[in-house]
Regions:
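Short, Lys/Arg-enriched N-terminal segments with co-localized hydrophobic residues
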Residues: 3, 20-35
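Tryptophan (W) side chains
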Residues: 10-11, 16, 23
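Intrinsically disordered, low-complexity segments enriched in small/polar residues
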Residues: 6-9, 19, 31, 262
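Cationic, amphipathic, low-complexity alpha-helical segments enriched
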Residues: 1-2, 6, 12
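N-terminal glycine-rich FAD/FM-binding segment characteristic of electron-transfer flavoproteins
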Residues: 31-266
């Protein structure tokens, strides 16, 4: 009787180990094939705590000796992509930025926040929203992401145009001013803020999303993650390799500070 019981337990344990191994392999295969890639666009801007100065010739904003940081709306986009990865819905987070060598600091910040790798498109020129959208379009066609995230606008020019132009150039569904994101199967539900309240959109993937302030609160980056970010890959490319002409059709005539308001009497 004891031998029969022991033999029965042996077969049960053997069967369980086989089943456990099967499900572990299946889950591992699912994690490799199913999760998606997110491409996050970030921009380096004058820190929001710095008072903006105008050049003496009124040709542009004077950023010399100014603290530069990641655009706050783009920081929210990075945070959301990292959170989606932590929930197992995304397998890779790629960040991309356009600018001079100083933009590398912004990319390292995004990598320290949890992004996996970065793409740096080198240029010294100031670009219009359309050129930026065309550039990100070329990157998107190479990377083939499932979700493209970017801030709804940059705080330096407040154009609020790149996301919309990008979606149009790629012919992809879009949601702007997003305050909530839910992913299920091969579709995405986005809640966006409109003048009358909230609007819920169901989008097929891939899709373009621009983030609002209410989507999340970016995490504080720890020192160990800052150190790890230095070892993550940053690929540098130029406009020639993308086949894009960065010359602008727009010319800035003059930049002035807002006119001072006259004191009122209450």
């Amino acid at each position: 009787m004891e031998r029969s019981v022991m033999k029965g337990k042996w077969w049960i344990n053997r069967y369980w180990k086989k089943q456990k191994g099967f499900w572990l392999i299946a889950f591992s295969k699912y994690m490799k094939e199913s999760p998606m890639k997110a491409l996050v666009c970030v921009k380096q801007v004058v820190d929001h705590n710095v008072r903006i100065r105008i050049k003496q010739d009124h040709s542009d904003v004077d950023i010399s000796d100014s603290k530069l940081s990641i655009n706050p709306f783009d920081e929210i986009a990075v945070e959301e992509a990292v959170r989606l990865k932590e929930r197992g819905l995304i397998s890779e987070v790629v960040v991309v930025s356009i600018g001079n060598t100083g933009v590398g600091d912004v990319l390292r910040t995004a990598l320290a926040a949890g992004a996996d790798r970065a793409i740096h498109i080198l240029t010294k020129n100031s670009l219009t929203p359309l050129i930026v959208a065309k550039t990100i379009t070329a990157i998107t066609r190479n990377e083939k992401p499932d979700i493209i995230l970017l801030g709804k606008q940059a705080i330096d020019d407040d154009c609020n145009q790149v996301g919309q132009m990008l979606a149009a150039l790629l012919d992809l569904p879009q949601a702007t001013n997003v305050s909530e994101i839910t992913i299920s199967d091969n579709s995405l539900t986005a809640v966006r803020e409109v003048d009358g309240g909230l609007e819920t959109l169901n989008l097929s993937l891939p899709a373009v999303l621009t983030t609002d302030l209410r989507l999340n609160t970016p995490r504080n980056i720890s020192l160990p993650n800052v150190i790890k970010a230095k070892k993550k890959p940053v690929k540098e490319i130029d406009f020639d390799s993308l086949g894009i002409n960065p010359s602008s059709r727009l010319t800035i005539i003059k930049v002035d500070e807002p006119a001072r308001r006259k004191a009122g009497i209450i």
